[in-house]
Structures are given as C-alpha cells and as structure tokens.
Swiss-Prot record:
It is found in: Nucleus. GO terms for biological process: hippo signaling; positive regulation of stem cell population maintenance; positive regulation of transcription by RNA polymerase II. The modification Phosphoserine is found at residue 148. Residues 14-28 have a biased composition (Basic and acidic residues). Pfam families: TEA (PF01285), YBD (PF17725). Residues 173-439 are annotated as: Transcriptional activation. The lineage of its organism: Eukaryota, Metazoa, Chordata, Craniata, Vertebrata. Expressed in embryos as well as in many adult tissues. Residues 28-104 bind DNA. Residues 1-12 have a biased composition (Polar residues). This is Transcriptional enhancer factor TEF-5. GO terms for cellular component: nucleus; transcription regulator complex.
Amino acid sequence: MASNSWTANSSPGEAREDGSEGLDKGLDNDAEGVWSPDIEQSFQEALAIYPPCGRRKIILSDEGKMYGRNELIARYIKLRTGKTRTRKQVSSHIQVLARKKVREYQVGIKAMNLDQVSKDKALQSMASMSSAQIVSASVLQNKFSPPSPLPQAVFSSSSRFWSSPPLLGQQPGPSQDIKPFAQPAYPIQPPLPPALNSYESLAPLPPAAASATASAPAWQDRTIASSRLRLLEYSAFMEVQRDPDTYSKHLFVHIGQTNPAFSDPPLEAVDVRQIYDKFPEKKGGLKELYEKGPPNAFFLVKFWADLNSTIQEGPGAFYGVSSQYSSADSMTISVSTKVCSFGKQVVEKVETEYARLENGRFVYRIHRSPMCEYMINFIHKLKHLPEKYMMNSVLENFTILQVVTSRDSQETLLVIAFVFEVSTSEHGAQHHVYKLVKD
C-alpha cells in the first residue's frame, strides 16, 4: 500500500483564545447556590420528570390543574423531603447551575483545537439555550442511556438534520427540529447482532439466481456498496502495547462485516441536501461529487463513538484506522479521507491500495493507517469535556468525508459521509447507515 501523509488546509494551532469574553461577563461574581444533598437529589429527579416548557403550564391529569414547571419542581421537593423551596428559589437555583454549566462549556471549548470561528459558533449555540434547557440537557444525559440508533420512518424535509433532539416529554415545535433517529423517552438498547466472519462474493450471480433476486445480490441496497465497490469493515482505534506479546485495543468506532438476507429491509434514505453545509463546498466537495454521481455510491453513517476507554494511555499509544473493501473487478483504488470542522476541510489523507485476489473476489485492505495529529488531539480534548452534551455539541460540527475512486479512470466508486455523537451505551460504539438520495 502506498500512502501519503496527512496534509492540513490551515494550522489547527492558529486559533486565538479571545473573542468570547462577552459571554463570560457577569458569571464569575454570582454566588453558587448550594442545597442540602436530599433537596438537590429531589431537585435533579424533578428536572428529569418535568421537561422545560417555557411560559406554558403543565396540567396534572389527576388534579386537572395547571402549574408552571418551577412550581411543580418545588412541590416535588416538598413531597420528597418535607422541606420547602419556593418557585422563585427553584428558578434562581436553575440559573446558578446553568451559569456553572456554561462556564464549564466555555472552558472546554477554549481548550479544543478549533479555529476562532468554530469556537464562536459553538458558544453561540450554547447561548441560544435557556437556563432550563441547559440544566435539563445535562440531567437527561446522565439519567438515560443514548437513543437506540434506529431510524424514524419519516422526518420533515424542512427539519435540520443537526439540531438537538426534543427534550423528554416534549413534542418538537417551531424551534425544535428532528434528527432522523428515534428519540424514545426511555430508550431500550437492542442486543447487537453477532459479528459474521463471512460475506457474499461480489462476483456476478448465476443466471438462475440472478432472475430469482432481480439480478441484485442481497447486500445491494442493504450495505455500504455501490455497483463497483463494497465496504466490508471500518474501524478507528487506539492500541497500547503492554509487553512484547500483549496489546490492548479500544475501538472508538467500528463497522463490522455483515451478511444481509433478502428479508432484511433496505437502507433508509436521507436527502443529501440536508448535509451539504457540513462538508466542503469547493471543488471535490459533497455537492459536486453527488451531481457527478453515480447516485448509488453515496452513503451516510451516523456513529455513536465510544470514548470510555479503560486502557491507560502511554507515550507508545498508537491511534489508527483500518478499512477493507471488496470488488468484482481488479482495480487500483485511491482513498481520500477529509476531516472537516464547520464544513471546512482541516486535513486530508490520500492512500492508494491495490487489489488482492481472494476466493474469487478482489479485496483491498488499508491496515493500521496512522491517525493524523489533529485527530489525536481532538479526541484527547473531547474526552476531557465534563458533560456528554458538551461533547455532542462539539461533534455536531465535526464530520469526515471519505471518497474512494478508481486511480486509473477517476470514477467515483464510493462516498461515505461520517457524522458523530458520543455513545454512553454499555455496548460501546454503535452506528447506523443511510443511503443518500436527492428527491
């Protein structure tokens, strides 16, 4: 395998540390409200029970009366502890906690290896949230497991793909948009399917089988595969050598080999125009690539990345990416990987891989390709943010675009857009695949 090193569009270290002092003003002089542990526990429970509702009232079905959220929280504290907190005290406590979360978020964003524009946008995103939303988002992240990565059957074409999910118990309104992923109030994580070590050949099917399956193999429209190339496996990982014969490995993200059946549903579709702004718009960007085609070569992968590594990092830790592809034809492929922040390319790596004939199919393996320094630093900074919702806020504007082409013909073989959130599941890294369409 021949590979080029990572190349940067601009130095990640050029970001300034100023530009957000206006958000800091007025925060540091506020006294931090401290409640006794029993009251604080009841307060946190109530936050999870009663979602933020603005100036609207909540009707209790057993009483038929309307209450403001803070009043309900105060009632809950009284019932649980026998101690009184007024709705004004609840409101003040929420504001104090929100300011604390904002400070933590600002410190985390400033520590990230991002340019100033990216930092400002991230801070503006936080500034658009109310105190109740900030505090409740933190509570829900801690209380409930992440959403099961199952697709919604329908989502509005006008909704923004990247907005935050509705809070517990809320229906999305004009200012609350929907992701194309289910957001159950009490998500239940389904068991993961067993890993399969085999996969179907990309060789043409016999005439009888072809007619029985409409001339298409089962993996067509059910996996990341165009008519020319199929992704078999993809992983990003950290590896630490314990001794000469022992390695410890942690997977940040992983797509394993699968062997779909005709009974499996085809991939759901996402309109490619919803994510144009998350990837470069210049020459070679997602929009230009899609217009060039072929349309069956474009896919979106949503990763829930596992950052909860139990491996102790050391100076010899290796960060890498491995991928594997298969084709019915012998080709030399070129794999371009672009790391993007706020739709702008930060670094790019281009690798060349040659075909190896295995069991009647041509296989391409990129094994242990080193991660760029930008990505390694990004992971380190991300892991040090104190809250999962802060990590996800940063990841909303972080994407990766992989483009696989034929080196000789320059034909586009496969385009994969990667987007990310943080997994809190005991199952570790998870993913869901969509095909990109343009209706």
